[in-house]
Amino acid sequence: FLVDHQANKELANAVGRPPERLPIKITAHIVHGNALQLDWTDILPASATKTYIFGNPPFLGHATRTTEQAQELRDLWGTKDISRLDYVTGWHAKCLDFFESRKGRFAFVTTSSITQGDQVPRLFGPIFKAGWRIRFAHRTFAWDSEAPGKAAVHCVIVGFDKESQPRPRLWDYPDIKGEPAPVEVGQSINAYLVDGPN
């Protein structure tokens, strides 16, 4: 609803009058809770032919996650050895579980460290093994926000699907605080966000 309202305000500024949208017929279904502890199949309708999950999970690296968050990751990944996995990888694990019986796509704004070091095989190994590919990605950029106390992190955006077409798309940031530039890609983007096989 908020995005719809903002778009209506922009339209009103451009043409002088917003569209008649009352009574409001579009409503959001907001669920309050820990997304990693909720059963997503209870929240997202099974009747959908495709489900799209995307978001901006918390930016917590391995050094800043709590004991409880580390246990959540162990439970989600089904292993005691989560090593340096960032907390955000829990959302990837939830998607792998959720999409075992459904079709769809998922994408997250995450800490850039998921594409570096020992996180790469721990995160991307299970994703690729389950038949997912990187459909699009934005390489490292500096997070910016108008919010007070904003996070000072470097991020990537990675989107996944199980389709072979279209060709994947990749963007780079020549200036880490600037605008993205498209990068030519062949048949695949690998876990390090470069053109090449996994």
Feature locations, PLM:
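Signature of N6-adenine DNA methyltransferases within the class I
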Residues: 1-20, 24-25, 35-198
